[in-house]
Amino acid sequence: MPRPRVSELSQRQAPRLRSSSSTSDSNHSNRLITTDQSFKPGVDRKSPRSGGPNSDPLGQKKLGGRISDLESQLGQAQEELRLLKEQLANAEAVKKQAQDELHKKSKKPNPLARVEESATEAERIDRDEIPGDVQKETDVFEVPVEKIAVEEEELRSGNDEAEKLVAKEDEIKMLKARLYDMEKEHESLGKENESLKNQLSDSASEISNVKANEDEMVSKVSRIGEELEESRAKTAHLKEKLESMEEAKDALEAEMKKLRVQTEQWRKAADAAAAVLSGEFEMNGRDRSGSTEKYYAGGFFDPSAGFMDPPGMADDYDDGLGSGKRKSSGMKMFGELWRKKGQK
């Protein structure tokens, strides 16, 4: 029975190792694709730019909506950041495990060198052996060849693990880059959210000031309205007072007119009396008395009753405004004076 060679064993083991390696690579690529699909940082995220603060309610409503939108985006970014950190931690754990396995396998002796030494020893024994002992030596040699094949498979598996480790390192680098981008975006959203909150606070304070000014203006308008009502009441009162004063003025003017008429009549009477005293009283007694009686028979003087009012004076007395007593007392004094002059 011919001896199996190491190269033939290696060729028989290689397809199985390649299939396992391809399966591992496909699993690794599927894991990367799943990671890429599950992580979509910042997709369709449009952060609004902040504008100037508006004191009108519509601007405040829009600003509040933008702040709530930013807060929701910030929460989504925090959740994605947490998932990225978990993926990075898992990748680090897998990397560490692969490094440990690779380190353990690197401490084992090199199976390729052992295979080469075994092949050289087998050829040497093949040349030196007797033909009758071929079957016996073949059975003895099959055990180390199978052992070498297992070690070669382990080596190939170690190489696959090393390739996986390299791919995992690339994945970790990519996750770190995405994590850095997410942290930057999270920081930017936080700053923008803080800026919008400050603008909202400024707008709220400005609206509060405007409302305070508005309340003050309303109170001023109310006070001015009350003052205007008071002024209207005062104006109406003054108008009534002015009307009453005008009525009193008209009454006084009428009284003054009557007094002027009476004064004119008194002046005429005084002139007549002076004329009588200066001219007609120079006659002797009886003639003078008779003439005096004749003179006063018209109603100016009555020796028994005193001085009489001239015609038309009684009506003026009746029309006077409360001055009848003063007029009568004045006429009595004038009559007494006239009587004394007559006795002389």
UniProtKB/Swiss-Prot annotation:
Compositionally biased spans, kind Basic and acidic residues: 93-103, 114-139, 186-195
Region (Disordered): 1-74, 92-139, 186-218, 307-344
Outcome of gene disruption: Plants have cubical adaxial epidermal pavement cells and show a loss of root stem-cell population due to a colapse of the root meristem. Pollen development is also compromised.
Highest rank taxon of the organism: Eukaryota
Bilayer-spanning residue ranges: none
One Gene Ontology term from the biological process aspect of the record: regulation of auxin polar transport
Entry keyword set: Cell membrane, Coiled coil, Membrane, Nucleus
Biased composition (Polar residues): 196-211
Effect on the protein upon substituting residue 270 to P: No visible phenotype
The protein's assembly and partners: Homooligomer. Interacts with ARAC3, ARAC4, ARAC8, ARAC11 and SEC3A, but not with ICR2 or EXO70A1.
Family, similarity comment: Belongs to the ICR family.
Record function comment: Acts as a scaffold, mediating interaction of ROPs with different proteins. Required for primary and adventitious root maintenance, but not for their formation. Promotes the stabilization of ARAC11 on the plasma membrane of the pollen tube initiation site but not the activation of ARAC11. Regulates directionality of polar auxin transport, and is required for the formation of a stable auxin maximum and tip localized auxin gradient during embryogenesis, organogenesis, and meristem activity. Involved in exocytosis and in the recycling of PIN proteins back to the plasma membrane.
Recorded domain comment: Interactions with ROPs and SEC3A require an intact C-terminal coiled-coil domain.
Name of this protein: Interactor of constitutive active ROPs 1
Lineage per the UniProt record: Eukaryota, Viridiplantae, Streptophyta, Embryophyta, Tracheophyta
